[in-house]
Amino acid sequence: MSFNTFGHMFRVTTFGESHGVAIGCVVDGCPPMIPLTEADIQGDLDRRRPGQSRFTTQRQEPDQVKILSGVMAHPETGVQVTTGTPIGLLIENTDQRSKDYSEIKDKFRPGHADFTYEAKYGLRDYRGGGRSSARETATRVAAGAIARKVLPDVKVRGALVQMGPHKIDREKWDWDEVARNPFFCPDKDKAAFFETYLDGIRKSGSSIGAVLEIVAEGVPAGLGAPIYAKLDSDLAGAMMTINAVKGVEIGAGFGAAELTGEENADEMRTGNDGTRFLSNHAGGVLGGISTGQPVVVRFAVKPTSSILQPRLTVDRQGADTEIMTKGRHDPCVGIRAVPVGEAMMACVLADHFIRDRGQVGR
């Protein structure tokens, strides 16, 4: 299996499976002399870690990261810094229950990658989905924590803005509220509603989808390049690599189709700090290049395919059968995808930041 690496100058290669010994990644292209410890990474991993509420999978993984390479104590200050060489990160798996999947090893789970992996490779790791499991995203979050260190002046934040058909009230958006509830929801009232709503979904053995919004503030104008290296193109592609993501939009996105030209175009005026925009329908990107406005990306996450309901399927021999998935699963996988979306945003921005320095010397 190839294509386990993303990025151009800031490159991330991930490895490992859901029920393997460990998962991990190698981050290549990180500049030297950046202070970096395991504690710098652990905070982001803890936000994504499973089993922290009844609304996520009850798999108990501590997700303790180990830095294997690419750092050393600065010879003068003693502070641990990056060396410019590949940074190896490892996260051990400690709470696998492969026996939960023994009954489905010959059946394809509807909505999962079982059928397509088997069609391509002739076999699949049925134990928790193997490489296709969202377990892999822990490594991206670890890489994203390093990317944030490359971009100290950029703040990347994410939130859940819709669950099922229920959207937040944007007039009540409060970033501080995101850390106060298990849904990463910026609307206090809607977070309380989601608690009751998702409890009902969870107890019925079903699942529900969500829409997440990732915002990067402090991004300088000029990142990205025309045509085939557009910043928004890379962001959309990065978000689409996240498990269960089925749609991505930048700025106004699909909503722009409902606007007139005068409504959609972000007008400009001269301000104290240079050019300022009167709106941000573009989501901080024009012509594939950042404008200096906040970069705004939203993506839709489908309902978790593993549900406690019988489903029609076929087996490896091509016979019709039924399947009911056991194991521990998220009733709304979109919840824990918020830190993953933040990580992918940070990695893409770090990549473009380094590429921009090489191209125009900023």
Curated annotation (Swiss-Prot):
NADP(+) binds at residues 48, 54. The keyword Lyase applies. Its EC number is 4.2.3.5. It holds the Pfam family Chorismate_synt. GO terms for cellular component: cytosol. FMN binds at residues 131-133, 243-244, 287, 302-306, 328. Disulfide bonds: none annotated. Belongs to the chorismate synthase family. Homotetramer. This is Chorismate synthase. The lineage of its organism: Bacteria, Pseudomonadati, Pseudomonadota, Alphaproteobacteria, Hyphomicrobiales.
